[in-house]
Amino acid sequence: MMQMLGQGFLVSLQLFVLTPLGSIPLGVPVAFMRMSKIAPLRWIARIYISVMRGTPLMLQMFAIYFAPYYVFGISLTPDSKWTACVVAFIINYAGYFAEIYRSGLQSIPRGQYEAAEVLGYSRMQTFLYIVMPQVAKRILPAMGNEIITLVKDTSLAFAIGVGEMFSTAKALVASQVSMVPFAIAALIYWVFNFVVEMLLGAAEKKLDYYHD
């Protein structure tokens, strides 16, 4: 039982790692599009963010998994489930991260940009050395909340047949007629979440050199 749950946890861990690797950088251009003065770009970003945040992640997984077959007639392969799952998680979380970035960037007073210009800073230097340190500190709690939510959201992958830890525990409960696999899975999720919270707390302390 523990071996099977361990294998399921590794799948959940892979999804947990791959999602931020894709969604954190993807959220950056979406955030800048959202703040763009070019109306079409701004509206594309607004619609994207609205769809990602306004529809269930599970529904997005189903759409990405089945769309190639029903729309283009592309045959589904054993790898299709995993690919659809990762893509759905990345584009979903990118929508949330984009809004977090936007709120962080727009929270910086305009006067700081003007002061940097007077001091001879270029736009890039202003962004890297003045704006980014403040934005990073301000958005970290919100980013942390999304990362913690992601730990639990990995269990949604079972909906399209990805063998992560929850689906493994569910199969074990059915075969063994026992709730023990669920209890062990819950404990693993809790420990994993606790470790993530500790790491995020350490990161917040690391950025505590700047005080509003």
Where do the language-model regions lie?
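Transmembrane alpha-helices and adjacent helix-loop boundaries
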Residues: M1-D212
